[in-house]
Amino acid sequence: MLKYEFLHGLQKRSHYLRQLSGQFFSRSYSSKIRNIGILAHIDAGKTTTTERMLFYAGKTRTLGEVHRGNTVTDYLTQERERGITICSSAVTFAWNGHRINLLDTPGHIDFTMEVEQSLYAVDGVVVVLDGTAGVEAQTVTVWTQADKHKLPRLIFVNKMDRPDADFEKCIADLKEKLEAHPVCLQYPVKNEDGVLAINDVITLERLTWQQKDLGQKYIRMKLEPSDELRDLQEKRNELIDRLSGVDDELADVVISTESFDKVDNHLIERALRRATGQLKVVPVLLGSAYKNVGIQRLMDAVNSYLPAPEERNQIYDCFGSEVAGKVFKIVHDKQRGALTLVRILRGEIKKGMRLISARGQAEVVSKLYEPLADEYREVNAVQSGDVVICAGLKSTVTGDLLTSSQSTLKNAQKRLKQSLGTTESVIPELDDESEESEDMFGLDPQIPDAVYFCSIEPPSISSQTAMEQALRQLQREDPSLRVSYDSVTGQTVLGGMGELHMDIIKSRILSEYKIDVDLGPLQIAYKETIESPALTTLSVEKEIAGAKQNVSITLELVKDKSEIFSLDKSPENMPNLNTLRPRILQVLKKGAIGALERGPRVGGQVVDTQIRLHNATIGRGTADSFVMATAAQCVQKVLSTSGTRLLEPIMSLQIVAPSERISGIMADLSRRRAQINDVLPKGERNKMILVNAPLAELSGYSSALRTISSGTASMTMQPCGFSAMNSVDESQAERRAQGLE
C-alpha cells in the first residue's frame, strides 16, 4: 500500500507566503486569482469552513471557532455574540500558487441583500450543505441568486462526520430541489471507530486526516484491489461518461481510448473545469470543517474548477485598459473612516487616483488595503480581477460603478452598444444617465422590499444629529435599510427585512456609535394599490418671494405593473407634451413618483400603479421645487379619487416536526390565515409542512411553535410577495397602524 504525506499550512511556509503576498500575489496575473463567495443556509458550517481555509493557508495561527467567538470573518460584536454572520466579510490568502479572495456571506434571510451585493464581486461560489439536513430554505434562496448571476459553483457537503449525515440524500436534494447537475468527486467512508475518511473518485485514493495536528496533514493511500476499489472505479467511469456527454474534448479522447481506465486524471480535471465554468455540472466534495477533514481538497478544487476573472465579465472589455470597478460593500472603521470594498473589473486602481461613480460623483482614493475581515494591509496598486479596499471615498454607495472619468464611461457605453449592434439608447427617454450605466453593465441593485418598519428616537435632542449621521453611514453599508421622515408624526422611520435586522441595527448604533436609541413597536410594511383608474387636474398659482409661480398638471393613475411613469401620447395631448423640456419632465416625474411612497390609508408604498402624464403647463420663472411639489399634490389628489386597497406581506415557511406533532401545528396555522401548500415526509419520523402565511399573523410564532411541538419542531421563513386583503383584515390593519390595537 503506497502512502504519501502532504503537509499544508506549516507556519514556516505560511510566513514565507505572507511575505510573498506583498510582492507577487498582490500583482499576480488574473489567471492565478480566484474570487469566490461562500453561501449556505444558517448553521450549515459556512463560517467554520472559512476559518479552516484561513488556518491551512497560514493566514491565522489558531482555529477560529464560532462558539468561542474568536472568528476572523465574523468580526462584529453582534456576530460573535449570536454565532451568526451578519455582514459579508472579505479575506485574501494564498493557496498553491493562487490568490483567493473569499467573501463569507450571511446565511440568515434578513441579510439577503448582503449576499446579493457580494455576488456581483465574485466569479464562482462554494455552497455549503449541512450533511444532516441537505438542501434547506435559504440554500434555495442563495442558489437562485447564484443562478441569476450565472455563477459556476462547487458543493461542499459539511458535517459528514455526524452519525445522522446522509450524503446520498444531499445529492438527491440537489437534483430535486435545485434542479442541479451534481457530479460527485468524493464519497464518505468511516473506519471502525467512526472516523471520517474520503475516497477520491478521480485518483482512486483514500484520504485520511490526522487530528493530532489539527488536520494539517492528510494521508493519500492507493486502494488495493477489493470490492471497494471496484465500486470506486465504477464511479470514476460514471464521472467520465457524464463529462464526455457535455465536453467535446473529453468525448474525443474517450472515443479514441480503449478503456475508461486509460483516461488520464488531468484530462478529467480539465474537462471538469470547462463543464463547471459553462454551468453544465456542479462538482460535489465533502468533509467536516469542525473536525478538520476535507478543507485542503476543497481549496484545491477552488483553484482547479472555478474560473479566473479573465474567464468572466467579458462585457467590461468595452472599458479597454481604463478602470471599471464594482462597489459591493462599505464598512466604517473607527480609525480609517469609510472603507469601500471594490471588485476591479478592468484596469488598475492606484493610491491617490481620482475616480468617478456612474452617478457623477468624483472621489479620490487616499489609501488602498488588502482585505482580511477587519484587519488591513496597505498596498499601492491593485489590478484587474482583484478585490481591494479603498479609503477616502466620501459619497460612493454600495452598488456603484466606478470609472476613471465620465468620458471613459460614455465611451464604454458607446462601444458596448456598437458590439450589441445598436446605436440607440436601450433606456427610455426619461431615465437618467446613471440608471443607464447600471442597467447596461448589469449592476442595477435589486433592493428587496422592507417587510417591517418602526420609529427610531435618540435618547435626547442633542443626540439627533449624531443618530442621523449613524443612520446615513449604516445605509451606505446596507442598502436594504430604509430611512425616511414621517412628516405627520415628525419621527424618523426605519424599514428593514425582519425583526433580527432591526435588532442588529439598534445594537450596532449602540456599540459602534454609543447612542442608545429607542425603537418603537415593529409595524408591518403594508403596501397599497389603486382600486380603480382616475384622472384629475390640479392648478396652483402662488407668489413666492415676489416671483409668480404657476403650474397646471393633468395626471391619470392606472393599474399597471410594467412601468411607473409614462406620457399619454394621444393626439390631443402630444402637442403640449412635446413642448416640455427634458429637465421639466424629470422634475415632474420625480415629484409624482415620490408621492407614491406614501399611500392615503396606512402610509404604505403605492404599487402596481402607473402615473400617466396628460398635460402640463408651467409658467415662466416657476421654480423646479414648486413644479415637483405640485406634481406630488396632484398624485395625492388622484389617489383620494381612485381609492386604494391594502396589500400585506406574505411569508413562505418550511416547518419540520415529528409526525405526531403535525396535526397540532396545522390547526394553529389555520387560525393564522395560512395556506398549506404541501406536507412531505422528512426522514423516517418527521414531516415537513410547506405553507404561506401573512406576516401579521406570525408575531411570536417561533415561540408558539416551540410550545406546540414541545421544542421538537424547527422552522425557516422568508418573504414571498404581497397579497390583497379582505375588508375586515384591512380595517384591522388600519387600526394597528393608527395605534388603536
Curated annotation (Swiss-Prot):
Keywords: GTP-binding, Mitochondrion, Nucleotide-binding, Protein biosynthesis, Transit peptide. It is found in: Mitochondrion. Residues 1-29 form a transit peptide. Signal peptide: none annotated. Residues 31-310 form the tr-type G domain. GO terms for biological process: mitochondrial translation; ribosome disassembly. GO terms for cellular component: mitochondrion. InterPro entries: EF-G-like_DII (IPR053905), EFG2 (IPR030851), EFG_II (IPR041095), EFG_III (IPR009022), EFG_III/V (IPR035647), EFG_V (IPR035649), EFG_V-like (IPR000640), G_TR_CS (IPR031157). GTP binds at residues 40-47, 104-108, 158-161. One of its GO terms (molecular function) is GTP binding. PANTHER family: RIBOSOME-RELEASING FACTOR 2, MITOCHONDRIAL, TRANSLATION ELONGATION FACTOR G-RELATED. Mitochondrial GTPase that mediates the disassembly of ribosomes from messenger RNA at the termination of mitochondrial protein biosynthesis. Not involved in the GTP-dependent ribosomal translocation step during translation elongation. Belongs to the TRAFAC class translation factor GTPase superfamily. Classic translation factor GTPase family. EF-G/EF-2 subfamily. NCBIfam families: small_GTP (TIGR00231). This is Ribosome-releasing factor 2, mitochondrial. It comes from Drosophila ananassae. The lineage of its organism: Eukaryota, Metazoa, Ecdysozoa, Arthropoda, Hexapoda.
